[in-house]
């Protein structure tokens, strides 16, 4: 059993061509491990949310509905360069019904307004629909990790401050360790940025 740990960064079969977890098996395995809650954060979609919620209710586990959204490097309307086709990852988790409504709106607008290779949101939308949401900095494909991998520590501090302006105390820096060299390289810098900005840390697994 794993007590005191909750998976907050989890992909299912609805992360198409990426996730291998089946929702039923995912929830039942979490229960077997003695976990009281589990999140679902598929890439850019919320297709599995209802099945996930119902399965969690059936198994007596708290369902944390979320999404790993794609954030446009510039704005969601910029669709002309290769960089626009490489959006940053960002994990959003619903705190309450308002958060669920706002996340649903963000995911919808990612498709209807921001789609360019991927459904993309931008900072303007995040500011508009931030209420009721918890934000995690995501994996090595997140903007914070990419900034640190580029060696831009000062820019990383500025970035975290910008996200804290949007999400306040509901913004967390993710720490992951899967034996990937890039993760190990930026880990001390993530800790430094967290200390310098007073940002809380959260340990996650990028579960697929």
Where are these regions (language model features)?
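Phosphodiester-processing cores and adjacent nucleic acid-binding clamps
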Residues: 1-208
């Amino acid at each position: 059993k794993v007590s005191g740990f909750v998976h907050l960064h989890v992909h299912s079969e609805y992360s198409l061509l990426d996730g291998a977890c089946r929702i039923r098996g995912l929830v039942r395995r979490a229960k077997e491990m003695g976990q009281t809650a589990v999140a679902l954060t598929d890439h850019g979609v919320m297709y599995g949310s209802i099945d996930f919620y119902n399965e969690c209710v059936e198994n007596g586990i708290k369902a944390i509905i979320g999404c790993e959204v794609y954030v446009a490097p510039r704005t969601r309307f910029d669709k002309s360069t290769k960089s626009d086709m490489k959006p940053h990852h960002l994990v959003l988790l619903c705190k309450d019904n308002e958060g669920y409504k706002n996340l649903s709106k963000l995911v919808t607008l990612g498709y209807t307004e921001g789609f360019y290779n991927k459904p993309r949101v931008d900072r303007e939308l995040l500011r508009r629909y931030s209420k009721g949401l918890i934000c995690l900095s995501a994996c090595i494909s997140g903007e914070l990790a990419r900034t640190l991998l580029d060696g831009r520590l000062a820019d990383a501090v500025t970035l975290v401050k910008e996200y804290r302006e949007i999400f306040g105390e509901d913004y967390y820096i993710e720490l992951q360790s899967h034996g990937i060299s890039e993760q190990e390289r930026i880990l001390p810098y993530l800790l430094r940025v967290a200390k310098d900005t007073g940002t809380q840390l959260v340990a996650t697994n990028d579960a697929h």
